[in-house]
Amino acid sequence: MAITAQMVKELREKTGAGMMECKKALETSGGDFNKAIDILRQKGLATAQKKASREAKEGIITSYIHMDKIGVMLELNCETDFVARNEEFRQLAKDIAMQIAASNPQYIQREDIPQEVIEKEKEIYKSQIKGNKPPQVIEKIVEGKLEKFFEEMCLLDQPFIKEPEKKIKDLITEKVAKFGENIMVRRFVRFQVGQTQDE
């Protein structure tokens, strides 16, 4: 299948990847748009992993208020002031702040969850399993429930509210590939009217 300039343009707009990368991905996928996106995502992930070791000391603090009832403050870091001033980076920060307001994550990533919290969840899931099931089946069920728990509790594992087929970590990975810089959520805080500190 011939790869047209229009196809390359559309893929660039959708992924934010470079023109040559988009062309190569379309050629590799035989013109299949979704496969090309997957190829770019995989490459982006490789790029993100290489860049993750670099320190992100620049960035912005952004806030989002929803109906005067929910407020979020977020620090999103990058490596250079140039990227921090970029409109697309600022939009990413806004989108993540909106995500936090809507989905109320408790942690940034699963590695931040204390081990005792995970163990407690596993015990609860095991106690909910009815019948005499083999240990490996129980383990599979518990793992599945734990994945759901991570999706609920961890910002990076949550489906993006604007594009639910994409996770927040995918969204960040795409921008890492586009800007060629490490990007990370440093911290966030979420307030809700009437909510106590322990809730």
UniProtKB/Swiss-Prot annotation:
Subcellular location: Cytoplasm
Transmembrane segments: none
Cellular component terms per the entry's GO annotation: cytoplasm
Keyword vocabulary terms for this entry: Cytoplasm, Elongation factor, Protein biosynthesis
Gene Ontology molecular function, alphabetical: translation elongation factor activity
Disulfide bonds: none
The protein's name: Elongation factor Ts
Provenance organism: Thermodesulfovibrio yellowstonii (strain ATCC 51303 / DSM 11347 / YP87)
InterPro entries registered for this protein in UniProt: EF-Ts_dimer_sf, Transl_elong_EFTs/EF1B, Transl_elong_EFTs/EF1B_dimer, Transl_elong_Ts_CS, UBA-like_sf
Similarity comment: family membership: Belongs to the EF-Ts family.
Role according to the record: Associates with the EF-Tu.GDP complex and induces the exchange of GDP to GTP. It remains bound to the aminoacyl-tRNA.EF-Tu.GTP complex up to the GTP hydrolysis stage on the ribosome.
Region (Involved in Mg(2+) ion dislocation from EF-Tu): 80-83
GO biological process, one term: translational elongation
